[in-house]
Amino acid sequence: MALLITLAACAGPGPEMPGRRPPALADLPPMKTFVTHRVTPPQRSNAAIAQDFLDLAFQMESGRSLPYMTRFEGPITVRVTGPAPASLEPDLAALLARLRREAGIGIHRVAADAPASVTIEFLPRSQLQRLVPQAACFVAPRVSSWEDFRQSRRSGEVDWTTLPVRQWVAIFIPGDVSPQEVRDCLHEELAQAIGPLNDLYRLPDSVFNDDNFHTVLTGFDMLILRAYYAPELHNGTTRDEATRVLPQLLARLNPRGERIGGSDLMSPTPRAWIDAIEAALGPGTAPSQRVAAARSAVEIARTQGWRDTRLAFSLFAFGRLALGQNNGETSLAAFLEAGQIYAAHPVTRVQSAHVAMHIAAFALSAGQPDTAVLIIDDHLDDVQNGENAALLASMLLMKAEALDMLGWTKEAAAIRRDALGWARYGFGSENEVRERMAEIAWLNPARTD
């Protein structure tokens, strides 16, 4: 805490210095990828998970209610069409294997020209966003191609609330983004294509949350999907019917959740807070309006009496946006408070790491490289376990700058090279890698090259 108090006293925008010029892409190390997945079971009671399941399965992100559950019956087939990037093959194979192993879902890939339950179509990002400007990627029912979607997008055909059973759906993903962005889209959109359609900001350990902290399906997500395809539930199950079935169903699937005591049920999230967060983080809003919306989200969270992830996320969003307005002291104060909330719970270690990266950046720009190294080292394992290559690369590049400042140039060079391997997966293009490396180099107040 003393380190952070000292850091707060030094808060201010980082110096704008010319950055280190990264090597050409041909000189970069090979792309690094995550080869193993650490399964972490849910850390909440089954009573809380049952409430989460109901809110995920019987409501849309817009707030519209769904009258009953829909799901696929029988084996689920997946095909890929369009110009898919090379990174898709191992990432999709790993995801399908996890769904079979952890969620017990019979799902497998078929040829591109075969009929399939789920079509994953790749297309240029510009083409996708011409029709759906706010979407990085998305899933639609009753269509099997982009052309189908174009023709049906203003009709009831792509309305999930009118769907009696899932027979075929299509996922649309840009093929010209980083490997990590492709993988993240795969996880979130395939989970919603076959499972619940809603996202809940209150969930601390889930991809079914628009805060985007978790980018690969978690143990909680796999439990939700396993329950979604349990024999006790079926197409047409209503919310009341699911409410009666879930206690015994979850006791069977997740016996450890029966042993977790305490009241971990969370209050509903008011629409005003969601609207404020979406205004703060969505496109097409002026910077000053974004800051005001984030401040409003913080105020609503405090009024609600929250001390959970929703207040922390409000503060995190406000901290990032205030930083963009060159308000370093306000930004750091928001990050520090968000970090304290996230650090209080083991289940939010991934969120803590995101906050820590920003605090470490303040330490670096304040000329405190030893503090930056301590902060980063405390979170690297959590970032690795969360499989976020972009965040991992950023933190390692920051650590390399800090070590340079401390005179450990040989160690800094080795860590920087390791970071660039992760950057190739997390950021993709040479230009993106260059930009990120330069941004972090600018944090070093001593750098003049």
Model-derived regions, located:
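C-terminal motif of bacterial Sec signal peptides marking the signal peptidase cleavage site
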Residues: 6-9
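Structural signature of alpha-solenoid helical repeat scaffolds
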Residues: 306, 346-347, 387, 427
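Helix-turn-helix repeat elements of alpha-solenoid scaffolds
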Residues: 269, 282-298, 325-337, 366-378, ...
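TPR/TPR-like (Sel1-like) alpha-helical repeat modules
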Residues: 335-339, 374-381, 404-427
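Disordered inhibitory propeptide/activation segment of secreted metzincin zinc metalloprotease zymogens
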Residues: 11-77
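Metzincin-family zinc-dependent endopeptidase catalytic domain
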Residues: 89-193, 197-203, 312
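Metalloprotease/metallohydrolase-associated module, dominated by Zn2+-dependent proteases
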Residues: 12-19, 62-63, 144-181, 199-309, ...
